[in-house]
Curated annotation (Swiss-Prot):
The keyword Metal-binding applies. GO terms for biological process: endoplasmic reticulum to Golgi vesicle-mediated transport; protein targeting to membrane. It comes from Saccharomyces cerevisiae (strain ATCC 204508 / S288c). This is Geranylgeranyl transferase type-2 subunit beta. Present with 1520 molecules/cell in log phase SD medium.
Length: 325
């Protein structure tokens, strides 16, 4: 990348806008299973860039509703695919961003809540769908979706919190499940789940200190962050690590200047978008987490983003906080 480093806002907006015009590309159809997630990533990036109107609200809402899986009572990534917790959260986030949760209607909302709660297991963990994959991503996904819907209960929250705490490791990180390797994305899902449950006080001061050190040690000499020791830096960890540090009040433990430079070097200055590392191909996933990371660092008057929900603070400020009064 040549010249002085700056965020190419307009190019990123045009890049995101162009993604749905590439239906002639084979890659477009290979990513069907990520379509609803991709719309959430794109919309959130546009919100951070202060350009949510780039997407046509009515068209997005219509597509979200077309992904409803009536057999299981939740949202799939694409019409006629199977429902999953991850895509259900994306659907709820999109509708909440547009202040359109009421389009669900009473019956669909009841079924949606039942689907989410029904994926919780006896140990407090959640499976993503009926096929049974279990890890801390789905605990966060379930609690986040229920929180946005205002439907958290102690029967769901308390065992979920117990499971998350069992995933804390001796090195200050969190794993996919108890005794699994620490990973930055799991730090976010676990800390995010505890924050949504209003249970961060279940972590001792010493544990919070250890978590902070493990997270800030993810920064490498070139400025980028990795997900675990001995791995390459990746722009997406600008979100997973920074949001986790923000949740525990240690955001300034990262060198902002170096991380900002790393993210900006990952931009495609011709077509827009952000990649995982400099000179690699861009995608909407790394674009949203790149601009979200910059927002957390207060860069260039970007729209403030909530580190717990990865949604604009102007949206999350309306959510009911658990425990409900």
């Amino acid at each position: 990348m040549s010249g002085s480093l700056t965020l190419l806002k307009e190019k990123h907006i045009r890049y995101i806008e162009s993604l749905d015009t590439k239906k002639h590309n084979f890659e477009y159809w290979l990513t069907e299973h990520l379509r609803l997630n991709g719309i959430y990533w794109g919309l959130t990036a546009l919100c951070v860039l202060d350009s949510p109107e780039t997407f046509v609200k009515e068209e997005v809402i219509s597509f979200v509703l077309s992904c409803w899986d009536d057999k299981y009572g939740a949202f799939a990534p694409f019409p006629r695919h199977d429902a999953h917790l991850l895509t259900t959260l994306s659907a709820v986030q999109i509708l909440a961003t547009y202040d359109a949760l009421d389009v669900l209607g009473k019956d669909r909302k009841v079924r949606l809540i039942s689907f989410i709660r029904g994926n919780q297991l006896e140990d407090g963990s959640f499976q993503g769908d009926r096929f049974g994959e279990v890890d801390t991503r789905f605990v966060y996904t379930a609690l986040s979706a229920l929180s946005i819907l205002g439907e958290l209960t102690s029967e769901v929250v308390d065992p979920a919190v117990d499971f998350v705490l069992k995933c804390y490791n001796f090195d200050g990180g969190f794993g996919l499940c108890p005794n699994a390797e620490s990973h930055a994305a799991q730090a976010f899902t676990c800390l995010g789940a505890l924050a949504i449950a209003n249970k961060l006080d279940m972590l001792s001061d010493d544990q919070l200190e250890e978590i902070g050190w493990w997270l800030c040690e993810r920064q490498l000499p070139e400025g980028g962050l990795n997900g675990r020791p001995s791995k390459l830096p990746d722009v997406c960890y600008s979100w997973w690590v920074l949001s986790s540090l923000a949740i525990i009040g240690r955001l300034d433990w990262i060198n902002y200047e170096k991380l900002t430079e790393f993210i900006l070097k990952c931009q495609d200055e011709k077509k827009g978008g952000i990649s995982d590392r400099p000179e690699n191909e861009v995608d909407v996933f790394h674009t949203v987490f790149g601009v979200a990371g910059l927002s957390l660092m207060g860069y260039d008057n970007l729209v403030p983003i909530d580190p717990i929900y990865c949604m604009p603070k102007s949206v999350t400020s309306k959510f009911k906080k658990y425990p409900y009064k």
